[in-house]
Curated annotation (Swiss-Prot):
Record keywords: Isomerase, Magnesium, Metal-binding, Phosphoprotein
Source species: Pyrococcus abyssi (strain GE5 / Orsay)
Gene that specifies this protein: glmM
Gene3D superfamilies to which the protein is assigned, alphabetical: Alpha-D-Glucose-1,6-Bisphosphate, subunit A, domain 3 (3.40.120.10), Alpha-D-phosphohexomutase, C-terminal domain (3.30.310.50)
Free-text remark on how the cofactor is bound: Binds 1 Mg(2+) ion per subunit.
EC number: 5.4.2.10
Database matches in InterPro entries: A-D-PHexomutase_a/b/a-I, A-D-PHexomutase_a/b/a-I/II/III, A-D-PHexomutase_a/b/a-II, A-D-PHexomutase_a/b/a-III, A-D-PHexomutase_C, A-D-PHexomutase_C_sf, A-D-PHexomutase_CS, Alpha-D-phosphohexomutase_SF
Gene Ontology biological process terms from the UniProt entry: carbohydrate metabolic process
MF annotations from Gene Ontology: magnesium ion binding; phosphoglucosamine mutase activity
Active site: S96
Name this protein carries in UniProt: Probable phosphoglucosamine mutase
Protein role: Catalyzes the conversion of glucosamine-6-phosphate to glucosamine-1-phosphate.
PROSITE patterns registered for this protein in UniProt: PGM_PMM (PS00710)
Entry PTM: Activated by phosphorylation.
Amino acid sequence: MGKYFGTSGIREVVNEKLTPELALKVGLALGTYLNGGRVVIGNDTRTSSEMLKKAVISGLLASGVDVIDIGLAPTPLVGFAIKLYDADAGVTITASHNPPEYNGIKVWDRNGMAYTPEKERELERIIEEEKFKRAPWNEIGQLKQANPREEYIEAIMKEIKLDNSYTVVIDPGNGAGSIISPYLHRELGNRVITINSDPHGFFVRELEPNKESLSMLAKTVKALKADIGIAHDGDADRVGVVDENGEFVEYEVMLSLIAGYMLRKYGKGKVVTTVDAGFALDDYVRGLGGEVVRTRVGDVAVAEELMKHGGVFGGEPSGTWIMPQWNLTPDGIFAGALVLEMIDRLGLIGELAKEVPRYVTLRKKIPCPNDLKAKAMEEIAKLIPREFSYEREITIDGIRIENDDWWILFRPSGTEPIMRITLEAHTKERAESLMEKAEKLVKDAIKKASS
């Protein structure tokens, strides 16, 4: 990670590390880097988003860059608008699934792909040196407002076709997806019920769509006998799914199902995922004639590998999916529509999920200050061989150790002050035993790093 940018742009607590002053410098740095051109900018529903957006816009205009402000917008709408308006870059003001006190700044290139670490380091260099381009009075950038929502919905409807109508419950989590996702599904011919769809910055539920945070969605689907529940995080770059039985569909299962559907739809090819994805994806994709490629965590890494390998689909086991035939921006709204197309062609999720191999996946977050992460990872690397016997090690992002029937990933979060442990085993007992050892190892490593 750089000084400002992590695995998903800048993401910090507002008015502590992420201030209007820093946002202004990011705008100036991006404008200096682009040296002219046009930038699309949008924001999520957080109370601080307008403040930060205006600061970024000021920096861009001051450096001579024209800005198209599309207002309240989910991340995928920004990615779509970059191409629609032939922009040179895009900026999203969002902290995605982080708590409401956080916000962030994420930059996208002209192809809708997140800025690579190399480009982010260049922006950091410009910020640190403060050698900003400042346009003369008669060359200051122009600011325009636009609303590409209708064009976005129309474009999705050209890609997604349903032969039948479904009852869909949508939970956008009071985020930016509230302004599009329900309307899209109505246009697709579905009966739509919404919960948590008021787009305010005081979120009713935890923004990360998981089994616990989507308990109300699950109850609603079951009570209404709906066909499916669709959920998003704060900026709708993710999708979470509840099946027709009111059961949350684990991310590993959904990742396998949608990867399989993309292989059926577009033909055999490579599926790109991250080091925290489990064995089920490999087994399922291999059975359909596909191949899995792994990379570091983060949508930009997935997008890079998709371009490198000409992959048919890229996804993380967090509900973050990239459909390269559509865009290189992770798009939870398009993904939700794609899930409906899949059940329209193949059957309801609860039945489809039975085809996916089931292993036990456990995840744990352990608090760790950002400035201790590097030292803690050094200590973890020393302790792992003493505590575990394993056959393979992968170090492209954190440390992943593997045997044929289990794996563990130790990784510092790029967006929060935590260490993440993700593991998978064939049985619950084995998984819990491994997690107990792994958790103790990480806590010991953090303790050593802090002494």
